[in-house]
C-alpha cells in the first residue's frame, strides 16, 4: 500500500498488516544566510513556492533569513512578482481568512491563487501576483502549519546559528524536505546532517530535489515515514535477481 496525505493516513495504513510505503507530514523550511547569492536564492524560492500554488508537499513553506541580508532579499523577491507583507495589519487580514478561530488551517484556501487570497483578505493591489511572502515570528501558525497555499513565511534570524535552530524547529522533525542557500561549504554540510530530511537541497529550488529541475527520476511522493525517501518505480515493483555462476565458454 502506498499511503500519502499526512499523519492520519499514515497511521491507518501502518495498522493494516500489509507492506506499506508511507509519506507523512511536511513543513519544508529553507535557510538563506549572509554568504548566499541573494538573487539566486530569491529566484529559486519563488520558483519552488509558486509552483502549482504551493500545494505540493515539497515546496518551500518557510524561509529563515539572516537579518543582515533581509532587506536585499525582500527587494529580490518583490522583483519576482511576490507580494511582500511586513505590516501587522496585512498579516492579520491574511491570518483571518487562512486560519480558523482555533488557529488551524482553513483548508478552503488550499491551492487557491495568491490573487484570490489577497482579494478575499481585503488587500487591494494594482497588479497580479503569484506568491505572497509574510514576514512574521517563529511561533506564528504561518510558520508552524502547512498551509498548502501560495504563501511563505519569512522569519528573521540574528545569525546562521540562530537561523539553523529556528529552521529545524519549524520543520518539526517531519524529516521530509529542507534546504539552504549558502556559499559556506561547512554550513551546507552541517545543515544537511542536522535536518536529516529525505530531501535536502543545497543552493537550489525544492523542485530540484524531486527531479523536475535537477537530476534523477521525478517523484512527487516522499516516503519520510517508512524511509524510502523519493519513491520511484523501483520501490513499487517486485525485485528479482538472476545469477550466472559459470562461464558459457567451452574449453573442449
Per-segment meaning from a language model:
Residues 1-13:
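Glycine-rich phosphate-binding loop
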Residues 10-138:
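ALDH superfamily catalytic-core signature
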Residues 2, 31, 64, 152-154, ...:
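Structural motif
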Residues 7, 69, 206:
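Flexible, active-site-proximal loop/turn residues at the rims of small-molecule/cofactor binding pockets
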Residues 1-2, 26, 66, 117, ...:
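Buried hydrophobic positions in well-ordered alpha/beta secondary-structure cores of metabolic enzymes
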Residues 4, 23, 66, 202-203:
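Generic beta-sheet signal
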Amino acid at each position: 500500500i502506498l499511503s500519502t496525505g499526512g499523519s492520519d493516513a499514515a497511521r491507518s495504513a501502518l495498522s493494516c498488516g500489509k507492506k506499506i510505503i508511507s509519506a507523512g507530514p511536511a513543513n519544508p523550511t529553507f535557510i538563506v544566510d549572509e554568504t548566499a547569492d541573494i538573487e539566486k536564492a530569491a529566484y529559486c524560492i519563488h520558483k519552488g513556492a509558486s509552483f502549482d500554488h504551493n500545494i505540493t508537499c515539497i515546496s518551500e513553506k518557510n524561509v529563515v533569513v539572516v537579518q543582515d541580508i533581509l532587506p536585499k532579499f525582500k527587494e529580490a523577491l518583490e522583483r519576482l512578482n511576490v507580494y511582500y507583507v511586513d505590516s501587522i495589519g496585512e498579516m492579520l487580514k491574511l491570518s483571518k481568512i487562512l486560519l480558523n478561530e482555533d488557529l488551524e488551517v482553513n483548508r478552503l484556501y488550499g491551492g487557491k491563487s495568491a490573487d484570490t487570497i489577497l482579494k478575499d483578505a481585503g488587500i487591494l493591489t494594482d497588479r497580479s501576483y503569484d506568491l505572497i511572502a509574510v514576514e512574521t515570528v517563529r511561533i506564528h501558525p504561518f510558520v508552524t502549519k502547512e498551509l498548502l497555499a501560495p504563501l511563505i513565511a519569512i522569519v528573521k534570524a540574528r545569525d546562521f546559528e540562530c537561523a539553523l535552530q529556528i529552521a529545524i524547529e519549524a520543520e518539526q522533525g517531519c524529516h521530509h524536505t529542507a534546504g539552504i542557500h549558502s556559499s559556506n561549504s561547512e554550513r551546507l554540510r552541517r545543515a544537511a546532517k542536522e535536518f536529516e530530511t529525505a530531501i535536502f537541497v543545497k543552493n537550489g529550488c525544492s523542485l530540484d530535489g524531486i527531479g523536475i529541475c535537477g537530476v534523477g527520476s521525478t517523484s512527487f511522493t516522499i516516503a519520510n515515514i517508512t524511509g524510502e525517501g523519493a519513491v520511484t518505480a523501483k520501490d513499487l515493483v517486485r525485485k528479482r535477481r538472476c545469477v550466472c555462476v559459470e562461464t558459457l565458454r567451452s574449453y573442449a
